[in-house]
Curated annotation (Swiss-Prot):
Lineage, uppermost ranks: Bacteria, Pseudomonadati, Pseudomonadota, Betaproteobacteria, Nitrosomonadales
Similarity comment: family membership: Belongs to the class-I aminoacyl-tRNA synthetase family. IleS type 1 subfamily.
Gene3D superfamilies tied to this protein: 1.10.730.20, HUPs, Ile-tRNA synthetase CP2 domain-like, Valyl/Leucyl/Isoleucyl-tRNA synthetase, editing domain
Species for this entry: Nitrosomonas europaea (strain ATCC 19718 / CIP 103999 / KCTC 2705 / NBRC 14298)
Subunit relationships: Monomer.
Known role: Catalyzes the attachment of isoleucine to tRNA(Ile). As IleRS can inadvertently accommodate and process structurally similar amino acids such as valine, to avoid such errors it has two additional distinct tRNA(Ile)-dependent editing activities. One activity is designated as 'pretransfer' editing and involves the hydrolysis of activated Val-AMP. The other activity is designated 'posttransfer' editing and involves deacylation of mischarged Val-tRNA(Ile).
Claim: Nucleotide-binding is one of the keywords in the record: yes
Classification via PROSITE patterns: AA_TRNA_LIGASE_I
This protein's name: Isoleucine--tRNA ligase
Cell compartment(s), UniProt: Cytoplasm
Enzyme class (EC, first level): ligase
Length: 939
């Protein structure tokens, strides 16, 4: 009877499929997680563990999620899961930012701008909830585990009340004041904008040089004659020349500013005498196409107080001094309109200049303003320029392209406009201050010093922003927002003396009824007869205040969480957004940051490094990736990319990610298949009885796990994925598993050589499945179920794998890792010779070869120590080893084996057919099949 020896091999199978089919399998796994209430189970088993709190920066509840949202949520999920596996209680409470103009704008687009305010708020609330539901489903589809049933929403009544209470604390600590200052103003929004709501884009603007005539009397010496010690003929007209890219602001001009320490030249030209900064004189004359002669020079300080005639308004303005003046462009003399610029405002305060804005909120000049009354600001540019040209005050006009602030929502240029607003002061504190004895800026800068940054360059960036930022304008003139619940005296324009008490009473009402409680409130309910002297403030809070105070409204209120958080994680734009607003409110309330560490990730760009935009057609939606390739592919791409810079994505990049995933999946499948008949309880062996290469790989895997825990701890996920991929493809696939196949397939099923291998594979796969779980969450769960655990169990209910006999592993690591590292190097040299022989047609496969190795010294001793097991390491049928005196004599020769091929193990051996009953087998296979089985010590 002919024996089918293939059936005698240990060729096991697994239900873990080769193809992931992730797009189909993942939704079913999500459903199972929800039905088993996995997140709640994680919380239950984590009770009593040390906490790790990653506080979710709330995305805005408007529109579908994009690839940047996916990157952000996946990074957070990787951290939460790795911390859970590390033995922390790491809850994740997702949140949404719900108030603000973008949502209100959507309602206006759909219903028009004339709805009653209460109806607008009602529609905004409903719209925000719809957007949250859509975004939530998309985030969950990415495999992000969290308290999705109880997210925090800034429009929740309790949080709206908490925001008002946070405002009260900042007020009590003396950081809040009302002032009329220039703020970023969006004409389309009809409201002030926060710094974080401003984007800089290129804009073409008129750049003009304008002469302000220095006033002198014809019958007396010109005032500049004494200042500059110059002879100035009677009747000479002298112009102080300014340069500006905003001609429309000239109606608001109140002064011309010079730097007190710069040199200024009086220059005689055919257009009159001009006053210019000395360093810029030649450039200015070239621009004006004029010849000129410098008559005299002086320091800017000497010019202070000179009177100038406004070029078209009926008023006299003064020369003032300011250190914000630069010589980078222009003339060195700065047109100063305190209503339209912060530098102008601050210097104007020093000189008592008015800062009333002639421009209304709709971008039009007040009717009473001469020349441009009722005109839109951008149209006023041409009128101003034509007027200056006609009057002879225009020395030059051109159009330039420069970086200019735009509204982040409307993508339109903004203006700077002085309006009565409420500010959180960076330097000042009110007389009622109960704060920490330092300015808010100093508190914030000290808090930055105490914060850890990932990557490290984030510290300098945030420090620079805090060091240079103006006071924070927190008031807005919109409907859909948390109201600034202040009562203002109608005549004195001061806050009610019982403001802290009133704020708490209003917060109590809002907690029950939402923000509508304030808007519908009759002041007499709280003020009684005093109500006739007070009016309710109708301004709402900047939405950055909403999200910036979640450390008060969420971290301190949710019993799952803790203040301060261990980590805030957002995109790099949040240095001027949520990171900063949270820092400022945290310092204003508690004197410290609400976080101990900040992690910043870059923006997503296409394969060529271009920003994604619908107009370019290079947008890749995360929903499409999940629905076609699977969320685990998206997660693997995120984790594989160094998030500290830009993250590139394209179809080609995703294709490479899929290939990486396949290699990992195939490795896992091999491990699972070869553990199909393994039961740890029955088949466990103490490592001392294992084959040496198995002990080596156990020690190597333990060292790998230790390294990866470090990568996870330092948030270096791309390093972790690179190491894991290399481990699967090179350490396992290219080395260990390649060697192991012979022993797994041909040794006795219950023999020590095979069980030794399976013991090692058991620990390797249990380590790997956990190490991959934070990244490949769906695949890790699929592997976990295949390992035979309970259907109710999950990899996320466990911690990192605990290896057996830790002390023995450590000892093995010190000895076996360097020993086998050298063996792997020598093996690589032999494999190259085998491959060359195969390419040249000398052999068919490595098993058809005899390898002759001449080695010297320690290398000979190392190879010789393996005995006959060396052939299994080299995956060849026969090895002849010979000692030589030195490296010069070392050689590797490959020849074709003259022996017969064993039908079962495919080795070419001299003893094939030595047992008549199994005439096509080698003696090793006969022993494994019908005898006591082979013995392996090393491989």
């Amino acid at each position: 009877m002919t024996i089918d020896y293939k059936k005698t091999l240990n060729l096991l199978d697994t239900s873990f499929p080769m193809r992931g089919d992730l797009a189909r399998r993942e939704p079913a796994m999500l459903k199972a997680w929800q039905e088993r209430n996995l997140y709640r189970k994680i919380r239950a088993i984590s009770q009593g563990r040390p906490k790790f709190i990653l506080h979710d920066g709330p995305p805005y509840a408007n529109g579908d999620i994009h690839i940047g949202h996916a990157v952000n949520k996946i990074l957070k999920d990787i951290i939460i899961k790795s911390k859970t596996l590390s033995g922390f209680d790491a809850p994740y409470v997702p949140g949404w930012d719900c108030h603000g103009l973008p949502i209100e704008h959507q309602i206006e687009k759909k219903y028009g701008k004339h709805l009653p305010a209460d109806q607008v708020r009602k529609l905004c609330r409903a719209f925000a909830q719809e957007q949250i539901d859509r975004q939530k489903a998309d985030f969950m589809r990415l495999g992000v585990l969290g308290d999705w049933e109880h997210p925090y929403l800034t429009m929740n009544y309790a949080i709206e009340a908490g925001i008002i209470r946070a405002l009260g604390k900042i007020f009590r600590n003396g950081h809040l004041y009302q002032g009329q200052k220039p703020v970023n103003w969006c004409i389309d929004c009809g409201s002030a904008l926060a710094e974080a709501e401003v984007e800089y884009e290129n804009k073409r603007s008129p750049a003009i040089d304008v002469g302000f005539e220095i006033i002198g009397r014809k019958d007396v010496c010109h005032p500049l004659a004494g200042v500059m010690a110059a002879e100035i003929p009677a009747g000479t007209r002298i112009f102080a020349v300014i340069w500006t890219t905003t001609p429309w602001t000239l109606p608001a001009n109140q002064a011309v500013c010079v730097h007190p320490e710069f040199d200024y030249s009086l220059v005689s030209t055919s257009r009159g005498w001009l006053l210019l900064a000395s360093e810029l004189t030649n450039a200015c004359l070239a621009r004006y196409q004029l010849e000129g002669r410098v008559v005299a020079t002086c320091k800017g300080l000497a010019l202070e107080g000179l009177s100038l005639q406004h070029p078209f308004a009926d008023r006299i303005v003064k020369v003032i001094c300011g250190r914000h003046v630069t010589l980078e462009a222009g003339t060195g003399l700065v047109h100063t309109a305190p209503a339209h610029g912060l530098d102008d405002y601050f210097i104007g305060q020093q000189y008592g200049l008015p800062s009333d804005s002639p421009v209304k909120g709709d971008g039009k000049f007040s009717e009473q303003i001469s020349l441009v009354g009722g005109m839109f600001v951008w149209k006023a540019n041409d009128v101003v320029i034509d007027t200056l040209r006609s009057s002879g005050h225009l020395l030059h006009a051109e159009e330039i392209e420069h970086s200019y602030p735009h509204c982040w929502r409307h993508k339109t240029p903004i203006i700077f406009r002085a309006t009565p607003q409420w500010f959180i002061g960076m330097q000042r504190q009110t007389a009622e201050s109960q704060s920490f004895g330092e300015s808010l800026r100093d508190l914030a800068l000290r808090a930055v010093e105490l914060t850890r940054f990932y990557p490290a360059w984030g510290r300098a960036r945030l420090e620079a922003m805090i060091g240079n930022r103006p006071d924070w304008c927190i008031s807005r003139q919109r409907n859909w927002g948390v109201p600034m619940t202040f009562f203002i005296h109608k005549e004195a324009h001061t806050l009610h003396p019982r403001t802290p008490e009133l704020l708490e009473k209003v917060a109590g009402l809002v907690e029950q009824q939402g923000i509508e409680a304030w808007f519908s409130l009759d002041a007499t309910e709280l003020l009684g007869e005093e109500a006739q002297h007070y009016q309710k403030l109708t301004d709402t809070l900047d939405v950055w205040f909403d999200s910036g105070t979640t450390h008060e409204t969420v971290l301190k209120q949710n019993i799952q969480l803790r203040h301060p958080a261990d980590l805030y994680l957002e995109g790099s734009d949040q240095h001027r957004g949520w990171f900063q607003s949270s820092l400022l409110t945290g310092c204003a309330i508690d004197g410290c940051a609400p976080y101990t560490a900040l992690l910043t990730h870059g923006f997503v760009v296409d394969g060529q490094g271009y920003k994604m935009s619908k107009s370019k057609g290079n947008v890749i939606a995360p929903q499409k990736i999940a629905d076609t390739l699977g969320a685990d592919i998206l997660r693997l791409w995120v984790a594989s990319t160094d998030y500290s810079g830009e993250l590139s994505i394209s179809d080609e990049i995703l294709k490479r990610t899929v290939e990486t995933y396949r290699r990992i999946r195939n490795t896992l499948r091999f491990l699972l298949a070869n553990l199909a008949d393994f039961n740890l309880a029955a088949d466990a062996l103490p490592p001392a009885e294992w084959v040496e290469i198995d002990r080596y790989m156990l020690a190597y895997t333990a060292a790998l796990q230790n390294d990866l825990l470090g990568f996870y701890e330092r948030y270096e996920f791309h390093q972790a994925v690179a190491r894991l991929h290399h481990f699967c493809s090179e350490d396992l696939g290219g080395f260990y598993l390649d060697i192991l196949k012979d022993r797994l397939y041909t040794s006795m099923a219950n023999g020590i050589p095979r069980r030794s291998a399976q013991n090692a594979l058991y620990h390797i796969v249990h380590s790997l499945v956990r190490l991959f779980a934070p990244v490949l969450s769906f695949t890790a769960e699929e592997v976990w179920q295949e390992l035979g655990e309970s259907a109710e169990d999950s990899v996320f209910l466990h911690t990192w794998h605990c290896f057996p006999d830790q002390s023995e592993i450590l000892s093995d690591a010190q000895i076996l890792i360097p020993r086998w590292q050298r063996l792997r190097e020598l093996r690589a040299r032999v494999l190259k010779q085998l491959e060359d022989a195969r390419i040249q047609g000398e052999i068919g496969s490595s098993l058809a070869a005899i390898v002759e190795i001449h080695a010297a010294g320690e290398d000979f001793a190392l190879l010789d120590s393996l005995g006959d097991d060396l052939r299994f390491v080299l995956i060849t049928s026969e090895v002849h080893l010979q000692r030589v005196d030195d490296a010069a004599g070392e050689v590797i020769r490959v020849t074709a084996s003259p022996h017969m091929k064993c039908e079962r193990c495919w080795h070419y051996r001299q003893d094939v057919g030595s047992v008549p009953e199994h005439s096509s087998l080698c003696s090793r296979c006969v022993s494994n099949l019908a005898g006591s089985g082979e013995y392996r010590r090393f491989a």
